[in-house]
């Protein structure tokens, strides 16, 4: 029954939506996409039975306890923060996808200011209390310095451009 199962995302072009677009492509599944304006409205819609499934981050779902059931996470293996949740990979779908978060500054920022910011961010990422707070929010950290993060973003951009050419997501919303 292609297109009969409805899934929600936190909006067109968001990380949650793109992960579901990849899921559809990798599995040959056709789902009916309903975009929402964020995690709160999407959670309410799932709990209210208005959509059957949703693409969301662990941090948006895990605090709900037993009200929502996480079926899979888009990682190579199980998260240490949610070890009972199987990965797509272990269920036969090689879907590995993460949400990127970072700090940026204007290109004209002086080198000494960039250096101080990088040092401060490195210290924050290494701080055990900060790491504990991130874990409490079900957010796994993968700290990368500027050049490494830029390289990851450039690779992701190329992958998204390819995805866009084969599956434009504006056409994917019904």
Please state what every model-predicted region is.
Residues 35-38, 57, 145:
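Short loop/turn segments at beta->alpha junctions
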Residues 14, 38-40, 75-77, 141, ...:
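Residue-level detector of flexible, active-site-proximal loop/helix-junction positions
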Residues 17, 22-26, 48, 53-83:
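A ligand-binding cleft/hinge motif common to bilobed small-molecule-binding domains
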Residues 42-43, 61:
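Short, hydrophobic alpha-helical packing/hinge segments within bilobed ligand-binding/sensory domains
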Residues 26-29, 111-174:
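An extracytoplasmic/periplasmic, membrane-proximal ligand-sensing/linker region
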Residues 1-37, 41, 88, 93, ...:
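Hinge/capping helix and adjacent helix->loop/strand transition within the periplasmic-binding protein
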Residues 35, 49-50, 67, 92, ...:
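Conserved functional loop/turn residues at catalytic and ligand-binding sites
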């Amino acid at each position: 029954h292609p297109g009969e199962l409805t899934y929600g995302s936190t909006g067109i072009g968001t990380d949650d939506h793109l992960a579901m677009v990849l899921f559809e492509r990798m599995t040959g599944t056709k789902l009916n996409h309903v975009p929402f304006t964020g995690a709160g409205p999407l959670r309410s819609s799932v709990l209210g039975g208005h959509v059957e499934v949703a693409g969301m981050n662990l941090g948006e779902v895990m605090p709900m306890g037993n009200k929502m059931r996480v079926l899979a996470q888009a990682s190579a293996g199980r998260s240490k923060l949610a070890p009972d949740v199987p990965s797509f990979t272990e269920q036969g779908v090689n879907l590995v996808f993460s949400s990127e978060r970072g700090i940026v500054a204007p290109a004209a920022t002086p080198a000494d200011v960039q250096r101080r910011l990088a040092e401060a961010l490195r210290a924050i990422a290494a701080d055990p209390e900060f790491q504990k707070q991130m874990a409490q929010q079900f957010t796994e950290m993968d700290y990368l310095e500027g050049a490494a993060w830029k390289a990851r973003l450039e690779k992701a951009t190329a992958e998204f451009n390819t995805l866009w050419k084969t599956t434009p997501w504006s056409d994917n919303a019904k």
